[in-house]
């Protein structure tokens, strides 16, 4: 069985997230989605609207997702060790250096393939584009 691990904040769920998860699932038999902790999101400059447990609950309900978990605070490698993925997928906009990530994982003695998933071409394909649209709509109303 090929286990795929997809990670993200998944705040304001949108079609870009669905694309990322569906494309990730196509690469294996089991999709494990790791939802970033609130503290991790904040440390990366993002302020989630939904708290980590709400985001985990939303992701868990998606039929493409086999299992959803919260990531470890401060150490992604602990999550990699726990999940034992064959493949880790990255979103088009995730700020990971693939070679550096591969090196860190190799040092743990784990063999993992890293795959960057393409951008969803539709409108409102990122949380920031959804937030921008909301601000435009609010500005028009008030």
UniProtKB/Swiss-Prot annotation:
- Could you tell me which pathway this protein works in? Cofactor biosynthesis; FAD biosynthesis; FAD from FMN: step 1/1
The reaction(s) catalysed by this protein are: FMN + ATP + H(+) = FAD + diphosphate
Q: Write one Pfam family the protein is assigned to.
A: CTP_transf_like
Q: Does the keyword Nucleotide-binding apply?
A: yes
Q: Which GO terms describe its molecular function?
A: ATP binding; FMN adenylyltransferase activity
E.C. code: 2.7.7.2
Q: Does the keyword Transmembrane apply?
A: no
Please list the residues that bind ATP: 9-10, 14-17, 93, 120
Superkingdom classification of source? Archaea
Q: Locate the transmembrane regions by residue number.
A: none
GO biological processes: FAD biosynthetic process; FMN metabolic process
Cofactor(s) listed = a divalent metal cation
UniProt keyword annotations, A-Z: ATP-binding, FAD, Flavoprotein, FMN, Nucleotide-binding, Nucleotidyltransferase, Transferase
| Its biological purpose | Catalyzes the transfer of the AMP portion of ATP to flavin mononucleotide (FMN) to produce flavin adenine dinucleotide (FAD) coenzyme.
Q: Which HAMAP family match?
A: FAD_synth_arch
What the entry lists under NCBIfam families is as follows: cyt_tran_rel
Question: Could you give the subunit structure recorded for this chain?
Answer: Homodimer.
Tell me which family the UniProt entry assigns to this protein. Answer: Belongs to the archaeal FAD synthase family.
Q: Would you tell me the protein name for this molecule?
A: FAD synthase
Q: Which organism is it from?
A: Thermoplasma volcanium (strain ATCC 51530 / DSM 4299 / JCM 9571 / NBRC 15438 / GSS1)
């Amino acid at each position: 069985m090929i286990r795929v691990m997809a990670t993200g904040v998944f705040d304001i769920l949108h079609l870009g997230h669905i694309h990322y998860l569906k494309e990730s699932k196509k690469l294996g038999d089991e999709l494990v989605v790791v939802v970033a902790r609130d503290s991790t999101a904040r440390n990366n400059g993002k302020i989630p609207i939904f708290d980590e447990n709400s985001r985990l609950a939303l992701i868990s309900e998606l039929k493409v997702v086999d299992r959803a978990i919260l990531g470890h605070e401060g150490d992604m490698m602990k999550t990699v060790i726990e999940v034992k993925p064959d493949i880790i997928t990255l979103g088009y906009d995730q700020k990971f250096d693939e070679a550096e990530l591969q090196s860190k994982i190799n040092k743990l003695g784990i063999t993992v393939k890293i795959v960057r998933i393409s951008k969803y071409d539709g409108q409102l394909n990122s949380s920031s584009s959804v937030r921008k649209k909301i601000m435009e709509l609010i500005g028009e109303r008030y």
